[in-house]
């Protein structure tokens, strides 16, 4: 697996930085885009919404002059000053009277701070709002506290220095100081800004608003400093790579990779030679040589000293190396790096870096030499680094087998050193000489001589023999040529056999299982990576796009660990799938207001439909003109919405963007691009899935649509007449207008000939204009487009119904011998027998041509004129087929029959307007069609015997 690099791609952390700067200061601010018309608001925090009572949906895209917060008592001079500051891109502070949503007013102190880019151009404005009454209360409380402290201090000091009889006593001064508290409380409760602006009091210092501005100058300067144009305080609105402190080393840099491999080789050297040196340091021969030739007589000791120095340098480098925290963020702050290293591997690295050879050189006693030699085995703690370094290769089968073999050999090497140390320690004290070293000397003809320290087998013979014994014992293949003879040797042999049986069973006995288990994940990774590379090679993807593909694949693999959630869920029953999905999306379903009040079953059904997606910075989620078939919920990160490369909105956590599906029968097209600024986690649900679930829970559907607040509606309002609104009474249209029942219901069916009267009707149905003329014009255009959209959809349905009815009429005229389907109520066969044989199609005088029209063909209006002609001599009972291109066709009679009934075959067809043709979600389905009205039912023909004549 690749190195865990963390979130190292360039990110636009503008919004996250501003929120992090302000979250501990209880700020109420908004951000406006200076490059848009009217400096539209693109973000407002929760504190602003709580202060004024508006939701974020109601504030977004409004001008940053905040005209919606002004009222009748708002001074025009303050509004002009604010507008002038925005127009001139100047920093200023404005004291203004604003109104909340509930019509309550309060005095507000507004700080306007322009934000410039790297070229010096103003791109954004940040407006900070403070309640002036709260500032006065804080300033007054601080002033009272200071005065109480000063009075108490002066009173206590004066009581000791004032002569008797001069001034009040200590008791009276104390009482006076305390007596001010109730009076201040009363004044504070009855505090009136206008009353105390002109007046003054001797007991309590009432601060005027301009004094508040002066006293809060430091606070405002802090805000300005936070919002200043310096690159080290306020981030620029652009993609920025993570800032790395000077002197720190990236954990994925080439230098760190080379250094890690060098340390890895040194650790392997330590693991091999440290037990060997510790075992042979116990020999008197080495000690005697050390005393005669000094510390540098052994090259191995010099190498050990160099290794110790390298380990110390590695500790210093680790204090300056970045790491990845639990949030996949690269941490480069030296203090945080030091704390993280102290809590982790510092103790192990420090113990392993102690230069024991220097201590041995300074102390010459045998006991100290033996102890220090044993302590050198602490260097084996460095093997933890090997496991940490090689863990990333644990999914490669060949590497795993190689590591297992090396581990087996390393353990055998350690046991061989211990086996030699046991024999070397016991040999001088054994009588008779039955140890394995004496037996080896007898076999080789190199017996030990007590007077000659150099006697006996060579070091190579002793080490190879010890290694041979440990390998044969670990693999349970003992030949007996090297055998334990003393009790210590036998106990050690038992331990070796126990370790060998465990290792043999766990490693060699399960090699096939280890290979299969380890190859599964890496096989999937390499298979997917190979597909990506083949796709890139086949389609000749350019290098920048190729790099994005590979980085996204690696990041997505590390993010999901190659787990396909859909494939995993398919193996579980549906009830368990719903529970798992409910757990995965629990944060969204619990905190989003739109899902509150839903039943457990509804939440389970919604959770199954939700999908989670992860987007890296710079990835475009929605392009301009894309079909809006998905609703997105942001759970982490921030995104920007662009129109013509101009930022129109910045969305963050808990924001929603897309299109409210309740307002339109068909999905619209996106009016902007949606691009990720940081690494984002989003929940998305398809339009069809959402409507399907809400159709199953109609009681919750109304609550959901009322509570759903889409932070930014991406639907293109000017994209043409594409869909029909699916609305409920009292809801909002796509542009935010509230429609009543008469406006949102199905409009009457209008004919093509009546389109000339459309404009006066639309003008009469328009709602009252708001006070702002510009908003009035925008509302009129949007309402007009909405009405035209309704009209177009209803005319399309009307045309399909008329074509269907005409095809049925032509089919009836083609088959005169059969029973007419339009004769309703004829039940007896005798009625058909008595029906006259002369019909319209058999008349010689008739010129009605229908024989060449296929029965399944649907005719248009022009084709009908070619096939249906009016005869010259037409019987009173012969039907006149008249076409009205803009009306629904129904039969009418030229002569009224007795009883007020109409004969369809003796009368021409007359037009009839049928209200309410729309309103069905799927009008083409038979089960959704409404019942036939009574005036549409064809009556019996006059020659029908069942017809009652008067």
Swiss-Prot record:
GO terms for biological process: membrane repolarization during cardiac muscle cell action potential; potassium ion transmembrane transport; potassium ion transport; regulation of heart rate by cardiac conduction; regulation of ventricular cardiac muscle cell membrane repolarization. It is a multi-pass membrane protein. It is found in: Cell membrane. Residues 594-694 are annotated as: cNMP-binding domain. Keywords: Cell membrane, Ion channel, Ion transport, Membrane, Potassium, Potassium channel, Potassium transport, Transmembrane, Transmembrane helix, Transport, Voltage-gated channel. GO terms for cellular component: monoatomic ion channel complex; plasma membrane. Residues 92-144 form the PAC domain. Residues 283-298, 362-370, 420-463, 485-490 are extracellular. It comes from the Eukaryota. SMART domains: cNMP. Residues 464-484 dip into the membrane without crossing it. It catalyses: K(+)(in) = K(+)(out). SUPFAM superfamilies: cAMP-binding domain-like, PYP-like sensor domain (PAS domain), Voltage-gated potassium channels. Belongs to the potassium channel family. H (Eag) (TC 1.A.1.20) subfamily. Kv11.2/KCNH6 sub-subfamily. The potassium channel is probably composed of a homo- or heterotetrameric complex of pore-forming alpha subunits that can associate only within their subfamily. Pore-forming (alpha) subunit of voltage-gated inwardly rectifying potassium channel. Characterized by unusual gating kinetics by producing relatively small outward currents during membrane depolarization and large inward currents during subsequent repolarization which reflect a rapid inactivation during depolarization and quick recovery from inactivation but slow deactivation (closing) during repolarization. Activates even more slowly than KCNH2. This is Voltage-gated inwardly rectifying potassium channel KCNH6. It comes from Rattus norvegicus.
């Amino acid at each position: 697996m690749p190195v865990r690099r963390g979130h190292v791609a360039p990110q636009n952390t503008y919004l996250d930085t501003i929120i992090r700067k302000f979250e501990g200061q209880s700020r109420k601010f908004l951000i406006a885009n200076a490059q848009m018309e009217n400096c539209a608001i693109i973000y407002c925090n929760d504190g602003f919404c709580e202060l004024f009572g508006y939701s974020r949906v109601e504030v977004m895209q409004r001008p940053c002059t905040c005209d919606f917060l002004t009222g009748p008592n708002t001074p025009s001079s303050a509004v002009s000053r604010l507008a002038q500051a925005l127009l001139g891109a100047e920093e200023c502070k404005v004291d203004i009277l604003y109104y909340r949503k509930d019509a309550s007013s309060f005095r507000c102190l507004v700080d306007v701070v322009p934000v410039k880019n790297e070229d010096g151009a103003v791109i954004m404005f940040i407006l900070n709002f403070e309640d002036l009454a709260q500032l006065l209360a804080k300033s007054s409380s601080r002033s009272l506290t200071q005065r109480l402290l000063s009075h108490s201090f002066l009173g206590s000091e004066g009581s000791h220095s004032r002569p008797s009889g001069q001034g009040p006593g200590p008791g009276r001064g104390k009482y006076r100081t305390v007596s001010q508290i109730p009076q201040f409380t009363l004044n504070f409760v009855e505090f009136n800004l206008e009353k105390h602006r002109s007046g003054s009091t001797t007991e309590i210092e009432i601060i005027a608003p301009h004094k508040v501005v002066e006293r809060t100058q430091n606070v405002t300067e802090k805000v300005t400093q936070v919002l200043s144009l310096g690159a080290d305080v306020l981030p620029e609105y652009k993609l920025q790579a993570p800032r790395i402190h000077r002197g720190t080393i990236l954990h994925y840099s080439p230098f760190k990779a080379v250094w890690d491999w060098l340390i890895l080789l040194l650790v392997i050297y330590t693991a091999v030679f440290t037990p060997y040196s510790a075992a042979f340091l116990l020999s008197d021969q080495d000690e005697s040589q050390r005393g005669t030739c000094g510390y540098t007589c052994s090259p191995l000791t010099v190498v050990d000293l160099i290794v110790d120095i390298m380990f110390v340098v590695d500790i210093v480098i680790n204090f300056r190396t970045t790491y990845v925290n639990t949030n996949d963020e690269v941490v480069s702050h030296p203090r945080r790096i030091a704390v993280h290293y102290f809590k982790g591997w510092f103790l192990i690295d420090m113990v392993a870096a102690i230069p024991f050879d220097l201590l041995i050189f300074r102390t010459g006693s045998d006991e100290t030499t033996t102890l220090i030699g044993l302590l050198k085995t602490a260097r084996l703690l460095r093997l933890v680094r090997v496991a940490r370094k090689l863990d990333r290769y644990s999914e490669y089968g060949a590497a795993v087998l190689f590591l297992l073999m090396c581990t087996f050999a390393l353990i055998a090497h350690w046991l061989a050193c211990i086996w030699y140390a046991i024999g070397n320690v016991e040999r001088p004290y054994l009588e008779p000489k039955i140890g394995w070293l004496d037996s080896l000397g007898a076999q080789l003809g190199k017996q030990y001589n007590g007077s000659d320290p150099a006697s006996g087998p060579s070091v190579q013979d002793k080490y190879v023999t010890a290694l041979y014994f440990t390998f044969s014992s670990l693999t349970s293949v003992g030949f007996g040529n090297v055998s334990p003879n003393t009790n210590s040797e036998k106990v050690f042999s038992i331990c070796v056999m126990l370790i060998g049986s465990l290792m043999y069973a766990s490693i060699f006995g399960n090699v096939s299982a280890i290979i299969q288990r380890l190859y599964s994940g890496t096989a999937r990774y390499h298979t997917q990576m190979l597909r990506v590379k083949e796709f890139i090679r086949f389609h000749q993807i350019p290098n920048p796009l190729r790099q994005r593909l590979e980085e996204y694949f690696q990041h997505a693999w590390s993010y999901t660990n190659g787990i396909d959630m859909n494939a995993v869920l398919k193996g579980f029953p549906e009830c368990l799938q719903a529970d798992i999905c409910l757990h995965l999306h629990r944060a969204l379903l619990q905190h989003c207001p739109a899902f509150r009040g839903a039943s457990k079953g509804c939440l389970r059904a919604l959770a199954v439909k939700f999908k989670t997606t992860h987007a890296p910075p710079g990835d475009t989620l929605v392009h301009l003109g894309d079909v809006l078939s998905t609703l997105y919920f942001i759970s982490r990160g921030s995104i920007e919405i662009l129109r013509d490369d101009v930022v129109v909105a910045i969305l963050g956590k808990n924001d929603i963007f897309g299109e409210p599906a309740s307002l339109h029968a068909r999905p619209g097209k996106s009016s902007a691009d949606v691009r990720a600024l940081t690494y984002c986690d989003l929940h998305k649900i398809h339009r069809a899935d959402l409507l399907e679930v809400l159709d199953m829970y109609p009681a919750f559907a109304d609550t959901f649509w009322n509570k759903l607040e889409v932070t930014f509606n991406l639907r293109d309002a000017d994209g043409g007449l594409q869909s029909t609104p699916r609305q409920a009474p009292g809801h909002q249209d796509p542009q935010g207008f509230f429609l009543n029942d008469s406006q949102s219901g199905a409009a009457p069916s209008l004919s093509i000939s009546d389109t000339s009267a459309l404009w006066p009707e639309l003008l009469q149905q328009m709602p009252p204009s708001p006070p702002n003329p510009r908003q009035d014009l925008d509302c009129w255009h949007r309402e007009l487009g909405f009405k035209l959209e309704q009209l177009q959809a209803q005319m399309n349905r009307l045309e399909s119904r008329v074509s269907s009815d005409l095809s049925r009429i032509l089919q009836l005229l083609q088959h005169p011998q059969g029973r007419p389907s339009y004769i309703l109520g004829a039940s007896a066969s005798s009625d058909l027998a008595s029906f006259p044989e002369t019909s319209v199609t058999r008349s010689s005088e008739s010129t009605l041509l229908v024989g060449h029209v296929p029965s399944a063909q649907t005719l248009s209006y022009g084709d009908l004129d070619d096939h249906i002609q009016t005869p010259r001599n037409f019987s009173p009972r012969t039907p006149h087929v008249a076409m009205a291109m803009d009306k629904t066709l129904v039969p009418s009679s030229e002569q009224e029959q007795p009883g007020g009934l109409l004969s369809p075959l003796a009368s021409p067809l007359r037009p009839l307007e049928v209200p309410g043709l729309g309103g069905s979600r799927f009008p083409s389905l038979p089960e959704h069609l409404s019942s036939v009205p009574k005036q549409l039912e064809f009556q019996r023909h006059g020659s029908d015997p069942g017809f009652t004549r008067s």
